[in-house]
C-alpha cells in the first residue's frame, strides 16, 4: 500500500481561498479597502467581528462541511508521527519554565540562607581571616551542603514551587480569615461598647434627672420651710412689738448694737479681761431687757412675768458662761478665738432668742425647766432600775452558791 500525501487544509483555509479567488454572487464584487481613512472595512469583515466560531459558521454554511460523502484525507505514518512530535514538543515548551529563571529562583533560598552568616562573620571581622585546616574543612562542607540543596531545589523545582505557592496561598487565606474575624470581632466590640455606653449615658441621664428632681423638691421644701419660719418670726416680732412704741424699739435696738460693738471692741483690744467681759455682757443684756420692759408702760403682772423671764435668761447665761470657760481651759489651744469673744457672741444671740420667745409664749421657759427636770428624772430612774437589776442578779448568784452538795446530787440524779 502506497503512502499518499494529502495537504492539510482546514475549512478556514478554504474560506480564505474562496474569499481571495471567488466573488460572492449575493454580495457582489469586493469593495476596495482604504486603510488610510478606515471608512471601508475589509471584505466580509462581519465574520472577523464574531467571537463565537459557531456564529461564524452560521453566516457561512460552507465553512464547516459535514457531508458524509466527503472522505477524509489519508494521512501517512510519517506525517502523523511528525505532527504528534510537534504537538508534544510544543506542549512541553509551554509548560516548562525557562532555564535561567529556574536557576535564579533555586539560588534565592541559598542566598537568603547565607546572608545572615556572611553578615555575622563580617560584623565579627572573621570572614576568611586566620582560617586554619578545620575552618576550611567546615567551609568546604558548608559549600557542599549548599550545592546539594541548590541541586535538589533545581531538580524538584516544580514540586517545591507548588508547595511554596500553596503555603503562600494558605497563609494569605488564613491571614484574610484572621483579618475578617478580627474586623467582625472589632465591629461586634464597637457595637457592644456603643450599646453599653448608650445604656450608661441613659442611666446617668435618668439618675441626674432624678437627682435634679429630688434636689428641686428638697430646695422647694427648704424654701417653703424658710418662708414659713420667717413668716412666723415676723409674726412673733409683730406680736411682741404690738403694744410698744415703734420709735422707742428702734432706738433701743440701735443702742443695743452700739453697746455690743463697743463691748466687743474693748475686749478685742485687750482693755477688758474675761471676767470683765462676762460681767459687762450680762449687765448690758439685763439693762437692755429691763429698759425694754420698763419703757412700754405695761401692766404690773406683765412686768413681773418679764422680770421672771429675765432672771431665767440670766441663769441660762451663767450656765453657758461656766461651760464655755471650762471648755476654753481644756481646749483653748485648738480655737482661733479667745474665750470671751465666743462667750460674748453666744450671750448676744441666746439672750435675744430667749427674750423674744418668752414674749411670744409666756411661761415657756418655766415649762422648759419642768420638761428638763422630768427628762433628768426619767434618766435617773432608768439608771436606778439598771442598778437594781444588777443587784438582784448578784443576789441570785450568791443564793445558788449556798445550796448544799447533797441537794445538788439529788437534783442531778432526778
UniProtKB/Swiss-Prot annotation:
GO cellular component, one term: vacuolar membrane
One matching Pfam family: WTF
Keywords attached to this entry: Cytoplasm, Endoplasmic reticulum, Membrane, Toxin, Transmembrane, Transmembrane helix, Vacuole
Highest taxon in the source lineage: Eukaryota
Region described as Disordered: spans on this chain: 1-94
Membrane-crossing segments per the record: 99-119, 136-156, 170-190, 192-212, 222-242, 247-267, 284-304, 311-331, 339-359
Bias type Basic and acidic residues, positions: 11-29
GO biological process terms on file: meiotic drive
Described purpose of this protein according to its UniProt entry: Promotes unequal transmission of alleles from the parental zygote to progeny spores by acting as poison/antidote system where the poison and antidote proteins are produced from the same locus; the poison component is trans-acting and targets all spores within an ascus whereas the antidote component is spore-specific, leading to poisoning of all progeny that do not inherit the allele.
Binding partners and assembly: Homomer. Forms protein aggregates. The two isoforms can interact with each other and with themselves. High sequence similarity is required for their interaction.
Family: Belongs to the WTF family.
Record-given protein name: Meiotic driver wtf19
Native source species: Schizosaccharomyces kambucha (Fission yeast)
Biological classification of the source: Eukaryota, Fungi, Dikarya, Ascomycota, Taphrinomycotina
Amino acid at each position: 500500500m502506497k503512502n499518499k500525501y494529502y495537504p492539510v487544509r482546514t475549512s478556514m483555509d478554504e474560506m480564505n481561498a474562496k474569499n481571495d479567488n471567488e466573488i460572492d454572487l449575493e454580495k457582489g464584487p469586493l469593495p476596495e479597502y482604504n486603510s488610510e481613512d478606515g471608512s471601508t472595512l475589509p471584505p466580509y469583515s462581519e465574520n472577523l467581528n464574531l467571537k463565537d466560531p459557531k456564529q461564524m459558521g452560521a453566516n457561512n454554511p460552507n465553512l464547516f462541511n459535514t457531508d458524509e460523502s466527503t472522505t477524509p484525507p489519508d494521512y501517512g505514518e510519517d506525517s502523523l508521527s511528525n505532527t504528534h512530535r510537534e504537538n508534544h514538543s510544543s506542549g512541553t515548551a509551554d509548560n516548562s519554565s525557562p532555564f535561567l529563571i529556574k536557576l535564579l529562583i533555586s539560588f534565592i533560598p541559598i542566598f537568603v540562607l547565607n546572608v545572615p552568616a556572611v553578615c555575622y562573620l563580617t560584623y565579627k571581622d572573621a570572614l576568611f581571616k586566620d582560617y586554619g585546616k578545620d575552618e576550611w574543612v567546615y567551609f568546604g562542607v558548608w559549600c557542599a551542603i549548599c550545592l546539594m540543596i541548590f541541586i535538589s531545589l533545581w531538580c524538584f523545582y516544580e514540586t517545591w514551587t507548588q508547595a511554596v505557592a500553596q503555603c503562600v496561598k494558605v497563609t494569605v487565606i488564613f491571614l484574610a480569615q484572621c483579618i475578617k474575624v478580627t474586623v467582625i470581632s472589632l465591629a461586634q466590640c464597637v457595637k457592644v461598647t456603643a450599646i453599653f455606653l448608650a445604656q450608661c449615658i441613659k442611666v446617668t441621664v435618668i439618675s441626674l434627672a432624678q437627682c435634679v428632681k429630688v434636689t428641686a423638691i428638697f430646695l422647694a421644701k427648704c424654701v417653703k420651710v424658710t418662708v414659713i419660719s420667717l413668716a412666723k418670726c415676723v409674726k412673733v416680732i409683730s406680736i411682741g412689738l404690738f403694744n410698744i412704741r415703734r420709735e422707742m424699739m428702734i432706738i433701743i435696738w440701735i443702742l443695743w448694737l452700739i453697746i455690743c460693738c463697743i463691748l466687743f471692741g474693748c475686749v478685742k483690744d485687750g482693755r477688758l479681761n474675761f471676767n470683765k467681759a462676762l460681767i459687762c455682757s450680762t449687765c448690758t443684756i439685763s439693762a437692755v431687757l429691763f429698759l425694754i420692759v420698763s419703757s412700754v408702760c405695761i401692766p404690773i403682772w406683765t412686768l413681773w412675768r418679764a422680770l421672771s423671764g429675765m432672771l431665767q435668761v440670766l441663769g441660762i447665761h451663767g450656765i453657758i458662761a461656766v461651760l464655755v470657760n471650762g471648755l476654753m481651759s481644756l481646749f483653748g489651744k485648738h480655737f482661733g478665738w479667745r474665750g470671751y469673744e465666743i462667750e460674748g457672741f453666744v450671750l448676744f444671740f441666746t439672750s435675744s432668742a430667749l427674750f423674744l420667745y418668752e414674749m411670744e409664749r409666756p411661761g415657756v421657759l418655766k415649762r422648759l425647766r419642768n420638761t428638763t427636770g422630768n427628762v433628768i428624772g426619767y434618766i435617773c430612774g432608768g439608771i436606778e432600775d439598771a442598778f437594781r437589776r444588777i443587784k438582784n442578779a448578784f443576789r441570785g448568784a450568791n443564793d445558788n452558791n449556798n445550796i448544799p452538795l447533797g441537794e445538788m446530787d439529788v437534783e442531778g440524779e432526778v
